[in-house]
Design a protein with these regions (language model features):
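Membrane-water interface segments at the C-terminal ends of transmembrane alpha-helices
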Residues: 6-23, 44-71, 81-183, 207-211, ...
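Surface-exposed acidic loop/strand-edge motifs in secreted or periplasmic proteins
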Residues: 74-75
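Short helix-to-coil transition segments within interhelical loops
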Residues: 115, 191-212, 254
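Flexible interhelical linker loops that connect adjacent transmembrane helices
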Residues: 25-51
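Glycine-rich helix-loop "coupling/hinge" segments at transmembrane-helix boundaries
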Residues: 1, 230-258
Length: 287
């Protein structure tokens, strides 16, 4: 726990430091262009440039996993039952989690906009109730839902519980990302729908969905990747028969099979890259 907190703090500090360096370089370039007519020109600070590239290299380290993993290619591991079950579990969980998150987010956005159109202050409660999930630790939320299922004598399967937990994590991300575009011109649209007698369902299908189509494709691909990489909700079950890709890699590490773990990670990274690449490619083609 302390190691994880320390690593998170270090990464946060490095990200803030990197951002400050970028802003410093931009401001320096702008000031240099403004004062380029002056006779004396001061060179850039070499130390800042070195620190900048060191921080960039730090965040580039995960990509070295690709080189390490692909150099330990193992065809038998890819065709093994454990890996195939893990990838199928991960895909099914992510698909169901994304569907639940998108449905919940669109429903919440619909209610949120309805309160805005009625000039009701209840829209704030909708926004807070969704976004507060961002501030609840993943382990806490997973434990609460697991405990509820325990009191119900485990009537829900592990697959469904993990999917619901993941959907809680990604729902506020989808909600916040789509909210600005979804409520855009809501007063004008509301008046036109009243004049033309357009039902809320038709408005959602014919007006809202085309309006947020591009943003929806991007955020679905992003949260799908996030759901694939989640490990917290799976580990609380302590069930070796129910494995996802992150748990499969973790078990390889625990068994000191580091080469196999790096190889699976490299395959997983390439797979995630294509998941993010094809939606962006589709949007660029239709732009």
């Amino acid at each position: 726990l302390y190691s994880g907190m320390a690593l998170g703090i270090i990464q946060l500090i490095l990200m803030l430091f990197l951002s400050s360096l970028i802003l410093f370089n931009q401001n320096y370039d702008q000031s240099f262009l403004i004062n380029k007519s002056s006779i004396t020109r001061f060179p850039k600070n070499n130390l800042i440039s070195v620190l900048f590239y060191l921080v960039v290299f730090y965040f580039f380290i995960p990509f070295l996993i690709l080189i390490k993993g692909l150099s330990n290619f193992n065809a038998q591991l890819i065709l093994s039952t454990g890996f195939l079950n893990s990838i199928s579990n991960s895909m099914l969980i992510s698909i169901l989690s994304v569907l639940l998150a998108v449905f919940t987010s669109l429903s919440a956005l619909f209610v949120y906009r309805s309160f805005l159109e009625k000039n009701s202050k209840l829209h704030k409660s909708i926004f807070i109730s969704i976004t507060i999930l961002l501030f609840i630790p993943s382990l806490t939320l997973s434990s609460i839902i697991f405990y509820l299922n325990f009191n119900l004598n485990f009537i829900f399967s592990n697959f469904l519980i993990v999917s619901v937990i993941n959907s809680f994590f990604i729902t506020p991300i989808v909600f916040v990302f789509l909210s600005n575009k979804f409520i855009q011109n809501y007063l004008y649209e509301s008046k036109q729908c009243l004049l033309l007698n357009i039902s809320p369902f038709i408005r959602m299908v014919k007006i809202d969905m085309p309006k947020i189509k591009n943003e929806l494709i991007l955020i679905i691909s992003a949260v799908f990747v996030l759901s694939l990489g989640d490990l917290t909700s799976v580990t609380i079950f302590n069930d070796s028969s129910f494995r996802t890709i992150p748990l499969f890699v973790s078990q390889l590490y625990n068994n000191y099979k580091y080469d196999d773990a790096f190889f699976i990670l490299s395959i997983f990274i390439i797979f995630l890259f294509f998941i993010m690449y094809f939606p962006s490619r589709f949007l660029n083609r239709n732009a």
